[in-house]
A protein has these predicted regions:
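A conserved hydrophobic secondary-structure block that centers on an alpha-helix together
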Residues: 52-124
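Short helix-loop-beta-strand segments that form the rim/entrance of peptidase-like active sites
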Residues: 246-273, 297
Length: 368
């Protein structure tokens, strides 16, 4: 199936003609890059001659870092963190969080924010690609530029002759600073293709009904110099599908085949947002109204540290009672008679914050 993805092909930042390095001194997401491109005069280049330093950039009942400053139509320079207010910065939309600082900048008329971060050079490569789509579409701009910058970039913008740390930068006057800031962002849309792989064993008297057994065969791949192989997530599920397919083939040869047709399907794009199963749900090979169930296998490598030694004969079971009043009973009966595994249903709790039921490929069957 076709998928489309935007990718940054060029990203540059300079201050007074001095070039800084991607991931060593600055980074941005694709939405901000799109905003830069759309606001640029030509060729994805955006230039300003002044920025406004606003300290931590916090506006709340106790602080207003924008008091007396005109930031309308300008880029603000904001320090990461807060004034020793514990975990308040971790709250998603608190005034001291990144979202809170962006909202404060927007509300005061700024068109962008440069966040001074201590996390440079970055340990892991910043992503240069956006979400995947089934139809060709441009990454939406958020009409606000947000760029993470190093203390070196901030020092140059504030006219320091040497690199200053955050504590020293905080002593700078909240004011407008003259400096030629140039941002360049260009992108292209990649035309990609991915695949779901299907195989089936035809049923007998109910062969026009379909039971799906699924797993995803993609993982995170390579990030910077680290390869994420995905042995558990979800190599374990993929080989389980293959083993089950082989077992049912042997059973059918012995005259003990299934009554319903079993479809064994490995899907791609799960880590990108359940893309493969979503595509199948929108473009089914077999009628969805004749699909009786989907048993999805994800991360069954049994590596949970809470199970040790002889207790590793377990599996987490999630979602069997969401749409069916019989599946849990069947699961328990078959397990008690044959497998005798520990069926751990802790993550099936609707109040569980992980919400695993909504985070793997079975959900695209359930949603239909």
């Amino acid at each position: 199936y076709p998928v489309y993805q935007d990718q940054l092909t060029e990203k540059k930042l300079s201050v007074n003609g001095r070039m800084f390095e991607w991931d060593k001194d600055f980074s941005m997401n694709l939405q901000s890059a799109t905003s830069i491109f759309q606001q640029s005069a030509a060729n994805g280049s955006w230039i300003t001659t002044e920025t406004v330093f606003v300290g931590y950039g916090i506006v709340d009942s106790a602080n207003n870092d924008y008091k007396g400053l005109d930031v309308k139509g300008k880029i603000v320079v904001v320090l990461e963190g807060t004034r020793g207010q514990g975990n308040a910065a971790n709250l998603l939309n608190s005034p001291t969080s990144l979202n809170g600082k962006i909202n404060a900048a927007r509300n005061n008329g700024a068109i962008g924010l440069l966040l001074v971060s201590k996390d440079f050079p970055k340990r892991n490569a910043s992503p240069v690609t956006g979400p995947m789509y089934f139809t060709k579409q441009a990454t939406a701009a958020n009409n606000f530029i947000t760029v993470n910058i190093s203390e070196a970039v901030a020092s140059a913008l504030l006219g320091r002759t040497s690199i200053q740390n955050t504590a020293s930068l905080l002593e700078s006057k909240k004011a407008t600073y003259k400096a030629d800031l140039k941002l360049v962002a260009k992108k292209e849309t990649l035309n990609l293709e991915s695949s779901n792989v299907l195989g089936l064993i035809e049923g007998s008297d109910k062969k026009d009904e379909y039971l799906f057994i699924t797993a995803h065969y993609d993982h995170l791949g390579k990030r910077d110099t680290v390869i994420y192989y995905g042995a558990d997530d979800d190599g374990s599920g993929t080989v389980s599908v293959l083993e089950l397919a082989e077992a049912f083939v042997q059973a059918k040869k012995k005259g003990k085949g299934p009554r319903r047709t079993i479809v064994f399907m490995t899907v791609s794009g799960e880590e990108k947002g359940l893309r493969g199963s979503a595509y199948y749900g929108n473009n089914p090979t077999f009628p969805l109204d004749k699909t009786t169930a989907n048993l999805n296998i994800d991360m069954v490598g049994r590596i949970d540290p809470s199970y040790k030694g002889d207790s590793t004969n377990y599996v987490y079971v999630i979602g069997e009672d969401k749409l069916s009043s019989d599946l849990m009973k069947i699961t328990d009966a078959v397990n008690n008679k044959f497998i005798k595994m520990e069926l751990d249903r802790r993550y099936n709790d609707p109040k569980d914050p992980n919400r695993f039921y909504y985070r793997s490929d079975h959900y695209n069957f359930a949603a239909k």
